């Protein structure tokens, strides 16, 4: 098969709002070859972000509709193809009718990269690392809105904060479902392949996506109590919720639908933004940590728990420690007390629930800084494309 076939698919994926950088070395082509067959690459290369039925695709590319349908369906669980559903139509198109299947090209991240656990080996891990360094990380992580959003851990926000942003209500998610998919972390596995070891935190940590109630329990399918307890343990250990937007799971309104649970030592987003030199990876939450100096004992727990090194001792003045409008906030760091670099803080709340003296709280950002969560795939894509256009 011609190299043009792989080039076409790479260009098509890069044309998506998520991005898939074209590098000088062509490492992205090697990632595609590692993950998919030639026939799969050819058909996927004919797709775009516009939703089409299998019959429409087959007619356009001149192939048998049964053959096209079979290939498309096989690529859905591997995330190279997205199955459209109500509320997820591309701009200018009507939402998919109930019972009608429409297909569109899926992104690399979040997408077929995370679905690559079945084929993940040292070669794939090295290719991904090279891709991130050569421009892939910046292309994916730098544009806004981010491909994932930070959701503060349970117990770090006031009830009124959660009421204002229902997509932060993790407990409501557990009440909506009885079964949950929890899978191994592809990032942690990649670190093990690259370095021969990883951190001691759990491998099974990601997903927590709701499943039909009749789904059989198993190694990766947990009931409500098991899933909630596991997520609670991960929160106490300092994992950060980098959550999926509701529309990625066909939710009709912004709501919590699942999350990666990330540690700074393994996470592809945290690691990738550092390798790429990107200031911000996941979309920050609308809250920032504030430390009250009076109950703070300078124990250092928050410094150790912060995944982005946004907290330090007050004597080591941070560049973003400036007079703050938040009630009770520190306006100047006190020697020996912990202080938050507001510009670096991502609003994850990990420091809040780990403070033994309850000296840390989360405060909302100003209305000018407030990030309004996209309510549909079309909304997210259009906002990201507008951002990209403005950068040119």
What are these regions (language model features)?
Residues 50-61:
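Short acidic, hydrophobic short linear motifs in intrinsically disordered regions
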Residues 90-137:
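Short, amphipathic alpha-helical interaction segments positioned at domain boundaries
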Residues 255-267, 290-309, 324, 339-358:
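Cysteine-centered iron-sulfur cluster-binding motifs in ferredoxin-type domains/subunits
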């Amino acid at each position: 098969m011609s190299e043009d076939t792989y080039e076409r698919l790479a260009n098509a994926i890069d044309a998506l709002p998520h991005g898939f950088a074209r590098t000088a070395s062509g490492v992205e082509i090697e990632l595609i070859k590692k993950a998919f067959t030639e026939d799969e690459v050819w058909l996927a290369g004919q797709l775009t972000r516009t939703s089409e039925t299998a019959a429409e695709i087959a007619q356009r590319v001149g192939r048998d509709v049964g053959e096209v349908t079979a290939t498309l369906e096989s690529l859905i669980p591997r995330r190279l193809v997205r199955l459209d559903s109500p509320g997820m139509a591309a701009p200018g198109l009507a939402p998919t009718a109930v019972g009608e299947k429409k297909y569109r090209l899926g992104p690399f991240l979040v997408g077929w990269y995370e679905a690559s656990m079945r084929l993940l080996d040292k070669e794939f891990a090295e290719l991904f690392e090279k891709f991130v360094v050569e421009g892939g990380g910046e292309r994916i992580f730098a544009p806004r809105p981010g491909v994932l959003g930070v959701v503060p851990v349970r117990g770090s926000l006031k009830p009124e904060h959660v009421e204002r942003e229902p997509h932060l209500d993790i407990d409501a998610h557990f009440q909506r479902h009885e079964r949950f998919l929890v899978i191994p972390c592809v990032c942690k596995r990649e670190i093990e392949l690259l370095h021969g070891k990883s951190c001691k935190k759990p491998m099974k940590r990601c997903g927590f996506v709701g499943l039909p109630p009749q789904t059989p329990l198993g190694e990766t399918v947990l009931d409500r109590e098991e899933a909630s307890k596991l997520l609670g343990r991960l929160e106490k250990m300092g994992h950060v919720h980098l959550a999926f937007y509701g529309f990625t799971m066909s939710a009709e309104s912004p709501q919590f639908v699942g999350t990666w649970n990330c540690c700074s030592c393994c996470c592809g987003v945290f690691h990738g933004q550092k390798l790429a030199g990107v200031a911000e990876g996941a979309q920050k939450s609308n809250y920032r940590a504030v430390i009250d100096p009076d109950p703070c004992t300078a124990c250092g727990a928050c410094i150790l728990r912060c995944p982005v090194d946004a907290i330090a001792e007050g004597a080591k003045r941070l560049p973003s420690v400036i007079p703050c409008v938040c009630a009770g906030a520190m306006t100047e760091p006190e020697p020996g007390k912990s202080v938050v670099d507001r510009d670096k803080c991502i609003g994850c709340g990990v420091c809040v629930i780990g403070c033994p003296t309850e000296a840390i709280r989360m405060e909302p950002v100003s209305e000018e800084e407030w990030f309004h969560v996209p309510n549909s795939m079309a909304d997210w894509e259009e906002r990201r494309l507008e951002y990209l256009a403005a950068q040119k």
